[in-house]
C-alpha cells in the first residue's frame, strides 16, 4: 500500500526546527573560526629551514611558549641552528612591544631581515667594524639582487646605513638591538639612544651567570663554549660553537659585563634605566627606558636568576701553590654536602692530617665519578678537573679541621677560666675565640708590625662560600655602579659577611614585628564588634565614656576603636589628596607644560580619549577641548588649588570637587565622641526617610546624609513647601559639608544612608555637633563604604553601633522583587533579614529582561531611571542619550547613574543596562545586585548584551 507524503506540509511544520539546528551549526563553526583567527593574531608563524633536534625544539618552546608557531621545514643543516631560530623569534618578540605603525631603529642588526619581510618602518644601523661586517653586507646585497630578479613587484629599497649607531641622525621613539650590544656595551647603547631620540629599547644578548666567576664555560643549549682572556680593559670573551666549522666571535668583556654591572646612565637631562627581563636558554632579554623627568637619587636593587649555577658552591683553593693567592672552584652543592656529612662522621682527631685528607679524597672521588651498575654507566655528581681535585680535597680537609676547632673552642668558652682568659678573649680575640674576630690590641699590632703574623689562619683564608641562588645587584642612580665588586675576589668575603649581618638583622626585626602583631591582635579581639548580629541585639548599658584626645592613650577598647577610626579617615583623605596631586603632577610633566604652553599635546589627546574630564586651560580663558564640566581647582607649577584665567593649568576628575585636604585637616585633631550610636537596619524601601521625618525635631536635632541626592530627598520630605530655605540647608547637610564648614550643636544626630559613610567620618560629624546620641539609618546588606584607593587598607571603615533595630517590611518593592531577592540571597548569608522580608506593594509583576546587541537598541525615556554597574557603561548611555533631543543635560545627570551612585534612590521605573559580556565582578556581588533590584516601585527592566557567567541579576529574575 503506497503512502503519500505531503512534502510542503512537512517543511512548513519542521522547517523552523531545521533552521534552528542549521543556525546552531553555523554559530559553532563561526565560533571555532573566530578562535583560530584570534590565535593567529596572538601568535607569529616562524619558518625555520634549519634542522633542529627534538631537544632544540623543546628549548625553543620553553623560551617562548605558545607566542610563536614554529614551522620546521628541516631543509638543510646550518651552523648553530637553534641560535638562528631564536634570533628570528627575538626579532618578533622585541618588535611586537611597539606600536605597529611607528618607525623603529635596529642597532647593529641585519637590514636584510626586515627588507625580506617588507617591514619598511625599520631603519638599520649596520656599521662596518671589520672584514666580517663588510662580507656580511656583500652577502645581503647578493640576496637582495636575487630577490629583485625573482619578484617583479618589489620596487622599494632597503633602509639602512653603515654609520655607527651613535653617529646616525635618523630619529625614532623605539629601537631594538638583537645581539648587537656586545660591541657597544650598556653605555654605548645609551649614547646611541640619545642621538636617535629613542625612548625605549629592547634587546637580547648571550649571557651565562658563570661568566661572573669563571674564566671559561659552556652554553649547553646553544652548544657554545666561551672563554675569557686578558686583563683589565683589554680583557675579551671568545665564543666558539662546538662541533662546527664557523667563524668565532670575540667581544670586549667590559662591554658585555656592563649589562650585568650597570643599571643607570645619565646623558644631559636624560636618565636611562636598564632592566633585565628574562634569562633563559642562555639568552638574556633586556630593555632600556629613557626619561626626562626629574629623578631623585636612589639605590636600585635588581635580581637575576642564574639557573645554571644555582646548585654550586665556591671552594677556594691555593693558586700556583701560593698561600697568598687563592681562586674559587665551582663544585656541586650536593657533592660538597655529602662529602662533608660523611667526612665529619669519619673524622679521626688523633690521625695524621694526611690520613683524614685521604678519606675525604676517597669520598670526593666516589661522589664525582662514573659508576657502572648492571653494565650501565651512571654519572654520580660532576667530575672535577685533574689539576684541582687534590686541592679541593685539601681545602675541604682544612675546612673540616677548622669546624672541629671552632666547636672545641665554643665548648671551652662555656667554662669560666679566670680574668686573664677573659682579657684575652675580649681584647685580643675581640669577644670570642670561636669566631676568631680581631680584637683591638691584636688589630693595632698587626697593622704596625705585619711581619709578626698575628692574624689567624681563618682570618686569611675562606674555604667555602655559596655562589648564590639569586644575586641581588645594587646600583646608585648615577653612572658609577657598586656592582663592580662582583669582579673583585678580595671583596667576596666582605660581601658575604655583610649579607649575613643583613639577614640576621632582618630576622630580628621580623621576630620583633611578629611579637608586636600578636599583641595588636589580642587588643583587636577586645575591640572588634561581632559581625553575626542577631535581631534585637541591644548591647548592655555601659558607664558614660570619657572623650579621647588624639594625643592621649585610650582608656578602653571602644574608646580606642573610635579614636583609631577618626584617625584612619583623616589618613584616608590625606592619601586621596596626595594621589590627586601626584596624578596631576605626572600629567603636567609628561605633557611638557612650562607655564605658558604644553609642548606635547599628543599625550593630553591620548588621555582625553579615555577620560573627557582631563583638559588643559590656556592663559586667557581658552580650553584645549570644549569645556563640559565645572572645575573648582587646577594644577600647575604652583600646585593644586584655585586658578585664574591668565594661568596655564591641567584638570581631571579630582578637580571638580577637591575637598580631601580640608577634610583631612579638619578631622585630624578631633576628639572621639562618647555618644551612644543606635542603628535602624531596614530592608530597601522600608521607609527610612519617613522615619527620619517622624523622629526629627528641628529645634534639637540635625540630619546628615552620605551624599547630595539623599540630602535633597530629606529636605523635600521635611520641608515640602520650601526645600531650598536657609533653615533646610542649616539642619540637613551632607557629611562632607558638615566637616568642611562646621555644624551647630545638637542633642541628637540623625544620619541617612549611614552605611555609605566611613565609621570615622560619622564619628567626626558627631564630635563636631557635640551630640548626646546618634540615630543612624541604613541597610547593612547594601553597598557599604568603599575605598577609592585599592592600596589603602581599611580597618575601621565599617559602622559600629551600641544597639540595632531591624525592619523587614518594605513599602516600595513589588511582590516579585521579594522572591527575586530571596533567590539572590540563597546560598549566601543565611541570617539575612531579606530571607523573611515582606512587601505592602500592590504591584505583583514588575520585572522583565531583554537581550540587546548594542547601545543603539536602548531607547531612553524621560519617565525612566537608568542604572549601570560600571562607569564605562554609564558613559556609553550618556553618549546614547545625546541622540534624543528631548533629553537635556540636567535630565541626563539626574536619571543616568551607576548602582553605587543610586543607592537610596526611589523611582517608579528603573532600567538596568549591561553593555558588555566580558568579566564584571559587580554582577557577582550581592550588595550591588541587591541595590539594583530594589530601586523601583512599578517596573524594572534588565537590558544586557550577551550572557555573562555568574550574573546574579539574570539568575535571580529569570
UniProtKB/Swiss-Prot annotation:
Ranges where the record places region ATP-dependent helicase: 680-943
Record bears the keyword Coiled coil: no
InterPro entries: (+)RNA_virus_helicase_core_dom (IPR027351), Alphavirus-like_MT_dom (IPR002588), CMV_1a_C (IPR022184), P-loop_NTPase (IPR027417)
TM stretches of this protein: none
Gene3D superfamilies linked to this entry: P-loop containing nucleotide triphosphate hydrolases
EC number: 3.6.4.-, 2.1.1.-
Name used for this protein in its record: Replication protein 1a
Species of provenance: Cowpea chlorotic mottle virus (CCMV)
